[in-house]
């Protein structure tokens, strides 16, 4: 697939989309070549910029996604200008999707490469990748930005071997009035102790995640990956810092580098600038040492794509034979225009670009592990389900469940005194109202009186939540109509 890029080098370097390009339909400016997978909030495609011939990546985000988070991601990418951070070229509104045009990194993520080759990385390879990653983090931290989701899946390599930070879906901006953040954001196994404890954190939270990523590149998965993520969340702050499973396999310099990243006290943890001076990083070799593993991974990927294409072609032939025998294979697409017909097929629409397999970790965590030799494999990008909702980490679902329980407990506190103190009072579960049969008419009337103000409060909360999601979309559409590029 990459030979297209080599045979047709860009006529000139694309730096940013101009005003004229941004007012056109995206299909007039780009040719979409193939789907790469799923990123945070949307599908990612490989495309070619018609004017320059340059390959780009386009993230297509449905507007029902959290647009505020998407705008934040765009804003952070737009402010960055570093060879170690994925570049942002511009964005479009197309029907119900937001198209974000970004730099394309042909070798994929580090975790993709590990998985495709079914091999972990050597110390030399890790040192070279860490050096570029630290330069990217040094730049971000100088700009007062925290990435908050550093892991091998978010470190991309171009075909020359240069590493770049990507996926700013949860990145944050530090301001003078908010020196530390208190929100739990990130992927559980890579999260710093202070992030989990919600005691406030700053840029060095990324350094902890980098130390975990170093272990991930060396061993194929992060520490605690074999246990339930909720257990890991409680173990990370309480246990000593993790280390290698087999320390004897690694040099003293490498182990010391990881040790300096994984200091539990953020005040004593090394910064990106300091770690760039560490002997392990200073002795890193040039990016040329990564070319062999990149070529090997790309060869594996190409062979798999060819095998998938053969399967698709074979299925097409079978479907064609069936069409000759049975015209009933042509069906109308429900909800489409009356004149639209669609070929019924057993193949998924995305079968030629994605492979599904069972991971040893829950898929919603977005983590990546080395597959067993007999497993089929997939990229770090996850296939989105039919609801097109972004995957939610299980630890966030846990906290949301706790919040729901707190809301249920507060239900009883708002009930009038006589009923609240009644021994018969109980919190209702959805669909379970059998206990009401044993109540007196007086108790039922009191309960009815208590429900009305509670319902009004819930409706108001829902209305505010709806408005908070609706307004940014309206603002963005209005801004686009005025041809003001605010991204």
Swiss-Prot record:
Residues 30-281 form the Protein kinase domain. PROSITE patterns: PROTEIN_KINASE_ATP, PROTEIN_KINASE_DOM, SARAH. It comes from the Eukaryota. The keyword Coiled coil applies. Inhibited by the C-terminal non-catalytic region. Activated by caspase-cleavage. Full activation also requires homodimerization and autophosphorylation of Thr-183. Activated by RASSF1 which acts by preventing its dephosphorylation. Residues 305-338 are annotated as: Disordered. The modification Phosphothreonine is found at residues 3, 183, 340, 367, 387. One of its GO terms (biological process) is hippo signaling. The record marks 326-327, 349-350 as: Cleavage. ATP binds at residues 36-44, 59. Residues 290-310 form a coiled coil. Gene3D superfamilies: 1.10.287.4270, p53-like tetramerisation domain (4.10.170.10), Transferase(Phosphotransferase) domain 1 (1.10.510.10). Autophosphorylated on serine and threonine residues. Phosphorylation at Thr-387 by PKB/AKT1, leads to inhibition of its: kinase activity, nuclear translocation and autophosphorylation at Thr-183. It also diminishes its cleavage by caspases and its ability to phosphorylate FOXO3. It is found in: Cytoplasm; Nucleus. It catalyses: L-seryl-[protein] + ATP = O-phospho-L-seryl-[protein] + ADP + H(+); L-threonyl-[protein] + ATP = O-phospho-L-threonyl-[protein] + ADP + H(+). SUPFAM superfamilies: Protein kinase-like (PK-like). The active site is at 149 (proton acceptor). Its EC number is 2.7.11.1. Its cofactor is Mg(2+). Keywords: Acetylation, Apoptosis, ATP-binding, Coiled coil, Cytoplasm, Kinase, Magnesium, Metal-binding, Nucleotide-binding, Nucleus, Phosphoprotein, Serine/threonine-protein kinase, Transferase. GO terms for cellular component: cytoplasm; nucleus. Stress-activated, pro-apoptotic kinase which, following caspase-cleavage, enters the nucleus and induces chromatin condensation followed by internucleosomal DNA fragmentation. Key component of the Hippo signaling pathway which plays a pivotal role in organ size control and tumor suppression by restricting proliferation and promoting apoptosis. Belongs to the protein kinase superfamily. STE Ser/Thr protein kinase family. STE20 subfamily. Homodimer; mediated via the coiled-coil region. Interacts with NORE1, which inhibits autoactivation. Interacts with and stabilizes SAV1. Interacts with RASSF1. Interacts with FOXO3. Interacts with RASSF2 (via SARAH domain). Interacts with AR, PKB/AKT1, TNNI3 and SIRT1. Interacts with DLG5 (via PDZ domain 3). Interacts with MARK3 and SCRIB in the presence of DLG5. This is Serine/threonine-protein kinase 4. The lineage of its organism: Eukaryota, Metazoa, Chordata, Craniata, Vertebrata.
